[in-house]
């Protein structure tokens, strides 16, 4: 019992030109933060040491959270990571981030929070701005490189993985 996978959302709004997910799973449906936290606390009490938060684009998470005073508010992914870190689970990972939505705030939290593993899956998809635009990706090669630099500046020993699509229609290089 080492790693448990916890779904935080389903669906996607991005509509990348090559992807079927928004048509099959529909728009994003976020789980309530309290349900996620409760599941992780139960996993930790059952001996699980690590959780991987899963969603098609976790950076677009926007879920309801009810505080101890019963006030309800909407929180973003970075806020959710803070709550998960407070559960006492030993290690936290997440999949997958879209470069267009990844924030420096999330990267700083990863660098500053011991339980957040310094590993990131950040799909590049293409190194060509023309192809990225044809894919309907919402970032440029330079923006991607800037994110990678920020990641390694904050976490020099971090681990970064990616996806690259080769042979996209219209690609000549």
Regions found by a protein language model. Name each.
Residues 19-35, 63:
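Iron-sulfur (Fe-S) cluster-binding segments and ferredoxin-like electron-carrier domains
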Residues 9-10, 22, 56, 97:
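Fold-independent oxyanion-binding glycine-rich loops
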Residues 7, 31, 135, 139:
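Short, surface-exposed alpha-helical recognition segments that flank or form part
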Residues 45-171:
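Conserved SAM/AdoMet-binding glycine-rich loop
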Residues 1-18, 41-45, 49-52:
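N-terminal pre-triad scaffold of radical SAM enzymes
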Residues 30, 170-173:
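Ordered, soluble secondary-structure elements with a strong preference for glycine-centered loop motifs
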């Amino acid at each position: 019992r080492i790693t448990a996978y916890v779904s935080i959302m389903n669906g996607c709004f991005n509509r990348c030109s090559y992807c079927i997910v928004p048509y099959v799973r529909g728009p994003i449906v976020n789980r309530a933060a309290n349900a996620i936290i409760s599941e992780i606390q139960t996993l930790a009490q059952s001996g699980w040491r690590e959780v991987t938060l899963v969603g098609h684009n976790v950076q677009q998470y926007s879920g309801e959270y009810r505080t101890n005073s019963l006030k309800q508010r909407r929180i973003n992914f970075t806020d959710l990571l803070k709550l998960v870190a407070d559960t006492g689970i030993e290690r936290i990972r997440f999949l997958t981030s879209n470069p267009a939505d990844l924030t420096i705030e999330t990267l700083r939290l990863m660098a500053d929070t011991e339980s957040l593993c310094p590993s990131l899956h950040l799909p590049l998809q293409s190194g060509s701005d023309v192809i990225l635009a044809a894919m309907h990706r919402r970032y440029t090669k330079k923006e991607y490189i800037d994110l990678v630099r920020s990641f390694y500046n904050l976490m020099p020993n971090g681990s970064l993985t990616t996806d690259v699509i080769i042979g996209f229609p219209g690609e000549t290089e």
